[in-house]
Regions:
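Binuclear metal-dependent hydrolase catalytic cores centered on His/Asp/Glu-rich metal-binding motifs
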Residues: 172, 176-179, 191-231, 235, ...
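Conserved beta-sheet core of the metallophosphoesterase superfamily
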Residues: 176, 226-305, 309-310
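Acidic/histidine-rich helix-loop elements
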Residues: 64-70, 95-108, 131-136, 162-165, ...
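Core catalytic region of metal-dependent phosphoesterases/phosphodiesterases
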Residues: 103-190
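Beta-strand-turn-beta hairpins that frame and shape the catalytic cleft
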Residues: 73, 79-93, 179-180, 186-199, ...
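Active-site neighborhood of phospho(di)ester-bond hydrolases with catalytic His/Asp-centered motifs
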Residues: 93-96, 123-129, 153-160, 182-185, ...
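Non-catalytic terminal accessory segments
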Residues: 1-73
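Membrane-interface segments at or immediately adjacent to transmembrane helices
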Residues: 41-118
Length: 312
């Protein structure tokens, strides 16, 4: 979906070119004012939901003089207090939107997944859009097999491109790699770490999360799109992990993403947000799609440390 701001701005420029006389000559300025007003409102709303910045980031450094960032991977580290845990720390690593294909080097995807395991995560979440074309399924299996492992498991949901391509084949590739799909249900983790459940939703393309979320559980939710955040927050979700947006994939320094595939425009384009009682983390993803190029938008791995600093 093209952002409303970009659409209105284009409309203003088009009107300015063709309307030069009469009362309608003011039309371009009215359209431009509407676009600027909408952009200002969206910035206010986004600021209201924005939460913490990463406590640190490791990887390729962003530079104004280096616009092409297609494979400039960065790992972002976040911390959230979670006193209900029975352990001092539960580390979650998230990857999203591999869009794995031969358009990017196989070695890039392998190195990206290896960097996830190198963080010694307790959990790994794979939040959808693993492939975009049927031809890439063998490559997906090659890259995934034997590569991802975490102390308490690796979990995944499918994304819209997975459903549009070959959902059953993607499920089989995930399963063969030892990855557990949580499409509309929950998996309870060992009681030794606390009351923690890992759940998934594949709405609106697949099954919606139907399992009730208990208020006393720490519920970690995989949702390919961040558009589900309002419903999930209302259901009592604790932390939601999403992708889908690619961070816009094409960004302008000082402005941000030009295009974000979300009903809420750029509101949840990338990073950490707080909606209701839920934390939301949105990954920019690892791959790129239409075009297979990133401009001022680095691919990322998100690492969230849920920390109990009150003693266990």
């Amino acid at each position: 979906m093209v952002g409303l701001f970009v659409s209105l701005l284009a409309g203003a420029l088009l009107a300015a070119r063709h309307v030069r006389r009469g009362p309608l000559r003011l039309l371009p300025w009215l359209i431009l004012l509407l676009a600027l007003g909408h952009e200002a409102l969206e910035r206010v709303i986004r600021h209201r939901y924005a939460a913490s910045a990463p406590v640190r980031s490791v990887g390729a450094a962003a530079s104004l003089w280096h616009p092409i960032t297609t494979t400039d991977l960065v790992v972002h580290f976040f911390e959230l207090p979670e006193p209900a845990l029975r352990v001092k720390r539960l580390r979650v690593a998230q990857i999203s939107d591999l869009h794995i294909s031969s358009r990017l080097p196989k070695a890039y995807f392998e190195a990206a997944l290896d960097s996830v395991v190198a963080q010694d995560p307790d959990l790994i979440f794979v939040t959808g859009d693993n492939v975009s074309h049927v031809d890439s399924l063998p490559l997906l299996s090659e890259v995934l097999t034997g590569r991802l492992h975490a102390r308490f498991g690796v979990f995944a949901v499918l994304g819209n491109h997975d459903f549009e391509t070959a959902p059953e084949a993607v499920r089989q590739a995930l399963s063969a790699a030892g990855i557990t799909r949580v499409s509309s249900d929950c998996v309870r983790l060992p009681q030794s770490i606390g009351r923690v459940v890992v759940c998934g939703t594949e709405a609106p393309w697949g099954p919606k999360l139907e399992t009730p979320l208990a208020a006393h559980d720490l519920s970690l939710i995989l949702s390919h799109t961040p558009d589900n955040i309002y419903d999930l927050a209302a259901q009592g979700a604790s932390v939601v992990f999403s992708g889908h947006t690619h961070g816009g994939q094409l960004r302008v320094p000082g402005f941000g993403a030009l295009v974000v595939p979300s009903s809420y425009g750029r509101r949840f384009d990338e990073g950490h947000f707080r909606v209701g009682g839920a934390d939301l983390f949105v990954s920019t993803g690892l791959g790129a799609y239409h075009p297979p190029l990133r401009i001022y938008c680095q691919p990322d791995v998100i690492v969230v440390d849920l920390v109990n600093d009150q003693g266990v």
